[in-house]
């Protein structure tokens, strides 16, 4: 099954010409200038985000929110459900869902926006709540999408304009859950300076798929993979930065 994974667009709608069966969007989608404005966020989602992504050459899109997506934390579930009704987009908040691919394989997918606390942002909860949410993931999960990364999982924030040193800033509670549960694939966002390559984390193939760099410039390409139920994969785009051949 060919998939496209991306995250952290912060209102910058990417042009994606490639086609795939499924797309995963791992949060931080709403423009920074309106992130705390509910009416503006709703209008942008309805008039900009949904038409743009609904026109993509994919059959299904799974979306989670990020720590800048305050709308999704405050909106009633009925509002969100109505917003995406009749579109390709399925919104997940600590939920499991099954997807039947074109080859007849069933994929179990889990999505969570939860992040560990480091300021006054959306979806940041104490460790006991995060553990409860992450443990909702089924034991036989195939694909996990989260905004945060687990501690030690592609989570080194490089020294830049925001951080004074290289350090791990991943989620300890997520790491604890992933010691017991091993999804085949895990796609994350949140860290604009993280390594964007696919790496192995305790048997799980994982990648940070944010598109913006630390200065909020569109720098990285969406990740495109051909994935197998066995956990094997083939990288379709060999270069992950803009301006290089896919």
Segments predicted by a language model, with ranges:
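Beta-strand-turn-beta hairpins that frame and shape the catalytic cleft
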Residues: 1-4, 96-111, 139, 143, ...
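Active-site neighborhood of phospho(di)ester-bond hydrolases with catalytic His/Asp-centered motifs
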Residues: 5-7, 23-28, 60-67, 91-94, ...
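Core catalytic region of metal-dependent phosphoesterases/phosphodiesterases
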Residues: 6-102
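Active-site environment of divalent metal-dependent phosphoester hydrolases
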Residues: 10-15, 30-34, 64-75, 96-101, ...
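Short, conserved loop/helix-junction motifs that constitute active-site signature segments
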Residues: 17-18, 52-58, 82-86, 137-138, ...
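Active-site-proximal segments of metal-dependent phosphoesterases and phosphodiesterases across multiple
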Residues: 30, 34-45, 140-182
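Binuclear metal-dependent phosphoesterase catalytic core
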Residues: 97-103, 176-181, 185, 192-246
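Binuclear metal-dependent hydrolase catalytic cores centered on His/Asp/Glu-rich metal-binding motifs
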Residues: 105-143, 163-172
């Amino acid at each position: 099954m060919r998939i496209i994974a991306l995250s952290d667009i912060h209102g910058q709608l990417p042009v994606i010409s490639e086609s795939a069966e499924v797309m995963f969007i791992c949060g931080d989608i709403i423009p920074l200038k309106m992130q705390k404005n509910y009416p503006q966020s709703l209008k942008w989602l309805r008039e900009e985000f949904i038409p743009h992504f609904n026109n993509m050459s994919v059959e299904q899109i799974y979306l989670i929110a990020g720590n800048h997506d305050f709308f999704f934390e405050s909106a009633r579930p009925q509002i969100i459900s109505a917003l995406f009704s009749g579109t390709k987009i399925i919104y997940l908040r600590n939920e499991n869902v099954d997807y039947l691919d074109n080859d007849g394989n069933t994929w179990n997918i889990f999505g969570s926006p939860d992040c560990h606390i480091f300021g006054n942002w959306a979806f940041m909860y104490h460790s006991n709540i995060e553990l409860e949410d992450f443990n909702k993931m089924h034991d036989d999960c195939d694909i996990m999408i989260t905004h945060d990364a687990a501690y030690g999982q592609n989570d080194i924030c490089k020294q830049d304009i925001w951080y004074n040193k290289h350090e791990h800033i991943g989620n300890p509670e997520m790491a604890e859950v992933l010691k017991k549960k091993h999804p085949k694939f895990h796609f994350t966002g949140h860290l604009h300076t993280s390594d964007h390559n696919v790496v192995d984390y305790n048997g799980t193939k994982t990648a940070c798929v944010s598109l913006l760099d630390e200065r909020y410039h569109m720098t990285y390409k969406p990740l495109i993979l051909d994935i197998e139920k066995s956990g094997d994969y083939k990288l379709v785009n060999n270069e992950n930065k803009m301006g290089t051949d896919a």
